[in-house]
């Protein structure tokens, strides 16, 4: 399951119909990749962050990995979720006149705490 499923993205954008599902899916993928790039995450790191499994009660199951503790993983996921939703909302609202430089600067600020290579 993805970190942010389509139904959650649509809820965040306040979109009720399925008319724009394809567009929202494309923008969601772009927002995810942009956030991964800005955070300087490797493919392995993103795979761990993006792999979420739930039990029958809807609780997140622990992920076997050597990169993060469960607490760190939860923190990184939360930061990534906020950044991805922000980027998605920005791209959705500014389809025609998006200022990608301003978006990237905002994402750097949002992702600073998990950004790789920042001392």
Model regions and ranges:
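Divalent metal-cofactor coordination and adjacent catalytic microenvironments
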Residues: 1-119
